[in-house]
Amino acid sequence: MREAVLVQMTWPGAPTIYYGDEAGVCGFTDPDNRRTYPWGKEDKELIQFHKDMIHVHKTCQELLTGSLKHVVSDYNVIGYGRFNKDAQTLVVVNNNDSPMIKEVSVWELGVPRECAMEQLILTTKDGFTTKKTQFPVVSGRIVINLPPKSGIVLRHVNKQQGKKFLHFE
């Protein structure tokens, strides 16, 4: 579920959350297409993940109006960049049952050939983190190592724009 939310909040267009998705409500087909909201039994971690991803979406201008470029395409793996003149965001999702390591060309997104990209969020099958981690970019490429059923959002802000921090509450 978190992988889908990660893509939804970083893909072009206005993300839509259908009633109860943020709390883990599921359904099938009509008339069981949407069950009642699970008051008192919500998936609080999933709600927090939605809040954090909405914060990323609203705070990163390149996610609102930036360009899109596919940078990774493999079986059950997708990677793309969202970018503008000020910042670049890289999104990679591994929907496989096994870990993956990919070397990704990020210079095509406008990321400098020698710098670092900052992890904004990492989701795995066991949970998620907003812990800031630096990923080195060497010769315009970055190495992404993802566990099974996971996704990551990395960001670089151009120096002339100053460092813009995302603060999670």
Predicted segments with their positions:
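Solvent-exposed beta-strand/loop surfaces of large extracellular or lumenal domains
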Residues: 118-139
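Short, surface-exposed beta-strand/loop micro-motifs that present aromatic residues
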Residues: 5-8, 25, 75-84, 143
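Aromatic- and carboxylate-lined catalytic core of secreted/periplasmic carbohydrate-active enzymes
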Residues: 37-73, 153
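Carbohydrate-binding surface patches
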Residues: 71-111
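Conserved, mostly hydrophobic/aromatic
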Residues: 8, 20-22, 53, 90, ...
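Aromatic/acidic polysaccharide-binding cleft in carbohydrate-active enzymes
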Residues: 5-44
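C-terminal beta-strand-rich structural cap/linker in extracellular carbohydrate-active enzymes
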Residues: 133-169
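Short, solvent-exposed loop/turn segments at secondary-structure junctions
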Residues: 22-25, 85-87, 95-98, 151, ...
